[in-house]
Amino acid sequence: PMKEVSIRGQGSLAYPGLRTQGNLETLSGPNDATRGLTSLADTFEHVIEELLDEQQVIQPSKENKDADLYSSRVMLSSQVPLEPPLLFLLEEYKNYLDAANMSMRVRRHSDPARRGELSVCDSTSEWVTAAEKKTAVDMSGATVTVLEKVPVPKGQLKQYFYETKCSSKGYAKEGCRGIDKRYWNSQCRTTQSYVRALTMDNKKRVGWRFIRIDTSC
């Protein structure tokens, strides 16, 4: 969804434009607010669908032959990305809208002290360079070297990975939040998913492979 324009010889990131249909400040009454939230959620669903469709129709060429190798958590750039991946932000905001829409229906029946929402496990997210990762495990279970730089027509770009892991300051050691410790044992653990990255195996063969990175807690 987020494409690195540097692949085509530019030096910045390209983000598709986003337009929402109204905002909460222009709404009046609970019914209008509910319709507004639904409209915003539908808008972001439409944007996500357009982004996915756009990614699927990208055709490799001599100038952007690697454009189809991007993941929402992998970025090729000449500098550290300043923001999380676009699709990641869209999913986070849509989840917020869904939660807000649900809380509006139950708010009048809820105790004010219980209206706040907390995650079961605390997590942190940040961009990590290939130099920091160094190695990773691919889909076959083999350990491969993650290459720091990717060659492009007009130079080289660095590989960045947006990783999410359990926070060391949260409930990782004390158990999951909301679990009754008198009856249950729980633990927050970092889980991984596969993303595609440029790597080198133990036989010095360089290629794009799916590797595991930390993606949730």
From Swiss-Prot:
<dbReference type="GO" id="GO:0008083">
    <property type="term" value="F:growth factor activity"/>
</dbReference>
<dbReference type="GO" id="GO:0008021">
    <property type="term" value="C:synaptic vesicle"/>
</dbReference>
<feature type="propeptide">
    <location>
        <begin position="1"/>
        <end position="108"/>
    </location>
</feature>
<dbReference type="GO" id="GO:0005615">
    <property type="term" value="C:extracellular space"/>
</dbReference>
<feature type="glycosylation site" description="N-linked (GlcNAc...) asparagine">
    <location>
        <position position="101"/>
    </location>
</feature>
<comment type="similarity">
    <text>Belongs to the NGF-beta family.</text>
</comment>
<feature type="disulfide bond">
    <location>
        <begin position="121"/>
        <end position="188"/>
    </location>
</feature>
<keyword id="KW-1015">Disulfide bond</keyword>
<dbReference type="InterPro" id="IPR020430">
    <property type="entry name" value="Brain-der_neurotrophic_factor"/>
</dbReference>
<dbReference type="GO" id="GO:0043524">
    <property type="term" value="P:negative regulation of neuron apoptotic process"/>
</dbReference>
<keyword id="KW-0339">Growth factor</keyword>
<comment type="function">
    <text>Promotes the survival of neuronal populations that are all located either in the central nervous system or directly connected to it.</text>
</comment>
<feature type="disulfide bond">
    <location>
        <begin position="166"/>
        <end position="217"/>
    </location>
</feature>
<keyword id="KW-0165">Cleavage on pair of basic residues</keyword>
<dbReference type="GO" id="GO:0030424">
    <property type="term" value="C:axon"/>
</dbReference>
<dbReference type="GO" id="GO:0050804">
    <property type="term" value="P:modulation of chemical synaptic transmission"/>
</dbReference>
<protein>
    <recommendedName>
        <fullName>Neurotrophic factor BDNF precursor form</fullName>
    </recommendedName>
</protein>
<dbReference type="InterPro" id="IPR019846">
    <property type="entry name" value="Nerve_growth_factor_CS"/>
</dbReference>
<dbReference type="InterPro" id="IPR020408">
    <property type="entry name" value="Nerve_growth_factor-like"/>
</dbReference>
<dbReference type="GO" id="GO:0038180">
    <property type="term" value="P:nerve growth factor signaling pathway"/>
</dbReference>
<dbReference type="Pfam" id="PF00243">
    <property type="entry name" value="NGF"/>
</dbReference>
<dbReference type="GO" id="GO:0005163">
    <property type="term" value="F:nerve growth factor receptor binding"/>
</dbReference>
<keyword id="KW-0964">Secreted</keyword>
<dbReference type="InterPro" id="IPR002072">
    <property type="entry name" value="Nerve_growth_factor-rel"/>
</dbReference>
<dbReference type="InterPro" id="IPR029034">
    <property type="entry name" value="Cystine-knot_cytokine"/>
</dbReference>
<keyword id="KW-0325">Glycoprotein</keyword>
<dbReference type="GO" id="GO:0021675">
    <property type="term" value="P:nerve development"/>
</dbReference>
<dbReference type="GO" id="GO:0030425">
    <property type="term" value="C:dendrite"/>
</dbReference>
<dbReference type="GO" id="GO:0048812">
    <property type="term" value="P:neuron projection morphogenesis"/>
</dbReference>
<dbReference type="GO" id="GO:0007169">
    <property type="term" value="P:cell surface receptor protein tyrosine kinase signaling pathway"/>
</dbReference>
